[in-house]
Amino acid sequence: MKIKKSVVCTLAAVAGFIVSAKAEFMVGYGREDVTPPLGTHLSGYFHERLADGILDPLDAIAVAFSDGTNRAVVMSLDIISLRGYFDLYREGVAAATGLDPQAVFIACTHTHTGPLVGSCRYGKKLDSFERASNYEKWLLDQLASAAKIALNDLAPAKLGIARGEAKGISFIRRYRMKDGSCRTNPGVGNPDIVAPIGEADEQVQLVRVDRTGKPSIAIVNFQCHPDTIGGNKISADWPRVVRETVESVLDDVKCVFVNGPQGDSNHICTDPAKRSPYLTRQTVYKHMGRKIGGVAVGLWDECRPVDVGKVGYSIAKVKVKSNRGRPEQLPEAERIVALHRSGQFAKIPGDTGMQKTTACAEARRILQLANGPDYFDFPLSTVTIGEALAFVGIPGEPFTGYGISMKKRSPFTMTVSACLVNGNFGYLPTDEAFKETGYETQGSLFVEGLEKAIVEGHLEQLERLFKNK
């Protein structure tokens, strides 16, 4: 039987979504160390910190997926953010591996005891590594190496999924106060607290990958700020403990952790009656990691099989309005930033440290957007496997509401939402949160309408990939 030329052309045109009948679904795993040298500037706070020790190493972990025609790699990186270098790292990994740049999904765990990378303002892009540090250049080599290891490790695989909960370790950090205001981190036992504003997402999602002739892979998803340790020592914080817990209990299993929307959550329980009197700054990160990892271990044997299928991927852009200040606000913003840079934190407006930090964040935002833009092109990254699994990447720190909404509305059997993927536009509050004041909203580059644009944009992307499965 002859096949018409037009049919052949049509098949070729959609080859990105076609899997040969003989093709096998395959998954690979790669890991590289990305620990910086001592003396490195650490990121996460509004003051300078130089690394003077190492509590535990930092990793770049890659999971590669192939359907025989299409390949994609999902990466988890123990770094707070790649700031302006995200595109350069993504394109560099693609060039080193032969992947489509849109098939490279780089997610940062957001540890606050890791190196400062791509130092520039939120939403800015750096065009080259010309001014990069030796570490920043070496980091590209390590990311590319982890991806190549994963692609070279591809083996026939089957998927299973399960969900559970890790309760009592993640808390909304924005609170309604008795005077009607909204405050971030108001302090443990503050008598003026009325209630948290928002809903903590305590769900643990597990993707079990069983491979022929090679170690299985556990992909664990939870959502909370990794900011429990502080100080000047390098650490991946509790996400590393999640991985260590899973790998130490389950036989012949490699683990990767993906942090979800965490912009308004952290580990601090402000209610003294509900706080454990035995947890300290030195132990809370281990407790969190063991609890999340323990839930994943408990779910391992309960994972239900799901059908695998075509590997899809996409980076789509949505246009979102920026939060520009008024011209009359510029002089005060310049004064506040100058005070902060000169170390005169006490002179910055505000009665508490958090209020002063909020003033700094707002001033920086006003100065950054003084000359525009009025709108940002906001990249949304997605990797999908058949009808079973979707990885949704948001380039910033979305509030937990984003993940809760997308998990409920996604057409895929399991949707893993990830923060700080292929970009960093700072805090991404929900539309409801934009009606409040506070650290995250006053410093955000955006205004109300952001959540709708991102969630609806991602859902359109998911529906498109789902139909082309």
Residue ranges and their predicted role:
Residues 292:
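Anionic-ligand-binding alpha/beta catalytic cores of soluble enzymes and soluble regulatory domains
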Residues 17-23:
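Sec/Tat signal peptide C-region and signal peptidase I cleavage site
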